[in-house]
């Protein structure tokens, strides 16, 4: 299980579910705050993913979250809907892409 944001970023391509992304064309911006935070984005295009550090000028969705909470989310210790409802997870942009996010990545084992 990843313990740092860098480990999450490095593991994303391996956790990616290409079948769930067929026909998709979207950019997810991640603004991870606090200790160990980072800014990175994923470009998803028809079943392929590219993970890049930094910011994208025109993402379809921006996800903002504290680094510790994001790692808990990735590791299955924090429910995404509960995180959103409690304000730990902030979403700006296309909400339907947020709903699809869970199917795009296999659970971390």
Where would I find each of the regions flagged by the language model?
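Feature captures hydrophobic
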Residues: 1-109
